[in-house]
Structure formats: C-alpha cells, structure tokens
Amino acid sequence: MSRPRLAVNYSPPLAQLVAAGEVAIDLYKVPDWDDLIAAARASGPCYVHFPVDLGATRLGVDLDRARELMRATGTSSLNGHLVPSRERFPDVAVGDVGAEARRRVAAALVEDVQALAAVVGAEDVIVENVPYRGEDHGLLRAGVDPRVVSEVVRATGCGLLLDLSHALLTTRTLGMDLWEYVDALPTHALRELHVSGVRPVDGKLRDHLPLTADDVAVVRAALARMRAGAWPIPDKVAFEYGGVGPVFEWRTDPDVLAEQVPLLHELVASLG
C-alpha cells in the first residue's frame, strides 16, 4: 500500500520551517498565481489548485493556461469546484433537491466537466465538494447533493476531490451526520483529500483553521477507510492551513504548522 503525498498550503512561514528541517512535506499547494508558484518552487515541489467554477456562469480560468501550468509544475489533476449558482439557474430554488432540479444541475455540471476533459482528459479532472451554507446564499443545494456529485463522476469518468471540512460545514447546515453524507459521495473515485480545522469564528463556522482534536479524529476515520480498502488511496492529502494575503495571513501561525504538519505526516505515512 503506497501512501498519499502530503501537501500543505504554501506560506513563507512554512517554507522557513521546511528550510530549517523542522517539518517535512512532499509538496506545496498553491493557487494559479505566477509569483506564488515561483516562490514555492524555489523551496520545493508544488502543485496548482485552480479556481475553476463548475455550474457557474463562467469557468473562471483560461484552460490553455491551466494546461501549461500543469505541465510546468507536474500538477497531475485539473480540479473544479461544484458551485451551481442562482445566476445560472434563476428558476431553480436554492434549496431544491427534487428530481428535476438534480437532473438539470447534474447535466450542466457534466457539460462543464467535459469542457475540462476536452483539454486534459477526463482521467485528469477532479471535482470538489464545496460547503453549503443555506438558502440565503448563492450556491444551489443540488450542487452538494451526493446523488448529483455521483452522477457527475459516473457520466464523465472524472475523479473526486473530497474536502472533509467542506463536508462538515455542509452537514452542520443541513443537520446531517458527517459520515452518512460523506459515505454517500462517490468515494470510490477519490483522488485527493483536503483537511483543515473547523470551529466558530465571530459566530460563524469557518474552515482553514488549526486542527482540533475532533478534526484529527475525522482525519483518522478517513484514513481508516483507506486502510480497510473501503476507499482508494488518493494521490494527495492536503492540509489547507496557512497562506498569503489578507484572507490567510491571520491564520498562518508558525507554531501551528510546526506542531500539526508533523502530526499529519505521521498519519499519512501510516498508510505506507
């Protein structure tokens, strides 16, 4: 059994820890920003996580550029976020998960995935579950429905990028059990796993935070499914903590990285 590669969001504090030999990772996770890709590659291998929006009014990326960045960095998969929007489906209620809403949303998502597959091949496309925040937000609930996600994977032959924190946020909104939801997703197609801490910040549940004991338990449970053969071993497990810019700098603590990256490295290595 080969273990997944451990990736962590690139940040200067993380790069300093890597350079000092205080933590070990397999590669950095970076957005499709040329300057950040260059900074990460100066410190070690990296892969690109693209801002592709599936089910929105536009994909949000230049697919030819994405293909070139994949080649330049060795990024193995072109990811897309399953984000069907009210703008694209003005006559579908946000909370509608009836058969017709699911059919329409799935058909549009399949069409968008096929646009990606035409550039890189379906086997190199992965789709990511995103957090559903309720009917007062713009994301259609059908986009997080496991039946829709499963149909997209079945119809296109793409893989799944499972974000455990996003799944937790979704199930908290819907009042569902986390594992009932996750196990209904097409985990047989798992290619990449994202993990991060989830806790309330200013009265709202947020992710991309330090792991709590509960978060670590969720990661252990996911890895146990891989160890038991219920899930395939993904290519990467990415710790989505830290980063650059105002969105991430306030949650980029070197002490957290120094403690939690080795913990995740140990957990991931246990699969090898």
What are these regions (language model features)?
Residues P45-A56, V94:
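Glycine-/proline-rich flexible loop or hinge segments
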Residues M1-L14, V23, D32, V244, ...:
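N-terminal pre-catalytic "stem/leader" segment of glycosyltransferase-like enzymes
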Residues G60-G159, L169, T252-D255:
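Active-site acidic/histidine proton-transfer and metal-coordination neighborhood
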Residues G95-A106, T170-P234, G242, V247-R251:
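Gly/Pro-rich active-site loop or hairpin
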Residues F248-G272:
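C-terminal helical cap(s) of enzyme catalytic domains, especially alpha/beta-barrels
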Residues P4-Y10, D26-V30, G44-F50, S76-G80, ...:
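Hydrophobic faces of well-ordered beta-strands that scaffold small-molecule active sites
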Residues P12, D32-D34, V52-L54, L82-R86, ...:
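Active-site-proximal loop/turn and secondary-structure-junction residues that shape catalytic pockets
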Residues M1, L17-V23, D34-V48, V61-S76, ...:
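Acidic (Asp/Glu)-rich catalytic clusters
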